[in-house]
């Protein structure tokens, strides 16, 4: 099963994850530098793993899939072994 959520990345390279019913622009006060969507899947070891992608229309910001996914994995303690 895959779950899709939204996120922003702050200038301090911290990720804020929230549900699809909220707008990225609801977090404008946190001065985001990137924004997008995240899904959770299962890696080859059978552990949950995030994947970031896409663009925020409400903030007019793109994601950086590679960087944002690494930030998410670190902050959510889901680094691959």
Where are these regions (language model features)?
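Intrinsic low-complexity, intrinsically disordered or marginally ordered coil/linker segments
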Residues: 1-81
